[in-house]
């Protein structure tokens, strides 16, 4: 009986699952929006939201905890310098998961995972219109 087990296995070994969630966390922190399958998105939320909560209190201990989980210096820097102050007044719920249809090859349900309060990309649109 698998009562009270917290994470989905996602048909992977534990090391593969850890590496996959670490890579997806780094991608989400870097790009602020990623497209993935719905079960992976739901598991990613359980990993990234505690990291952003760590980023709200910039201490050396929290930086080391975040680096231990992410293993990427640039992601940790962005987490504490950009995302922590952005979500300082929000008490949780930093991600939005939007259903995004189904994948063509295997009909897997897809999802768009994005950080809330992202800055708008109006500057890029204005440059495109000017050309």
Swiss-Prot record:
GO terms for biological process: translation. Keywords: Ribonucleoprotein, Ribosomal protein. It holds the Pfam family Ribosomal_L17. Gene3D superfamilies: Ribosomal protein L17. One of its GO terms (molecular function) is structural constituent of ribosome. GO terms for cellular component: cytosolic large ribosomal subunit. Coiled coil: none annotated. It comes from the Bacteria. InterPro entries: Ribosomal_bL17 (IPR000456), Ribosomal_bL17_CS (IPR047859), Ribosomal_bL17_sf (IPR036373). Transmembrane segments: none annotated. Part of the 50S ribosomal subunit. Contacts protein L32. PANTHER family: LARGE RIBOSOMAL SUBUNIT PROTEIN BL17M (PTHR14413:SF16), RIBOSOMAL PROTEIN L17 (PTHR14413). Belongs to the bacterial ribosomal protein bL17 family. This is Large ribosomal subunit protein bL17. The lineage of its organism: Bacteria, Pseudomonadati, Pseudomonadota, Betaproteobacteria, Burkholderiales.
């Amino acid at each position: 009986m698998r009562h009270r087990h917290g994470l989905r296995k996602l048909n992977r070994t534990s090391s593969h699952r850890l590496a996959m969630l670490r890579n997806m966390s780094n991608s989400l922190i870097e790009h602020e929006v990623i497209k993935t399958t719905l079960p992976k998105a739901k598991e990613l939320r359980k990993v990234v939201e505690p990291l952003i909560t760590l980023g709200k209190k910039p201490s050396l201990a929290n930086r080391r905890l975040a680096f231990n989980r992410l293993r990427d210096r640039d992601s940790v820097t962005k987490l504490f310098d950009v995302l922590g102050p952005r979500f300082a007044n929000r008490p949780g719920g930093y991600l939005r998961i939007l259903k995004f249809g189904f994948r063509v090859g295997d009909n897997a349900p897809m999802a768009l995972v994005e950080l809330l309060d992202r800055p708008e990309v109006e500057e890029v649109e204005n440059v495109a219109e000017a050309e």
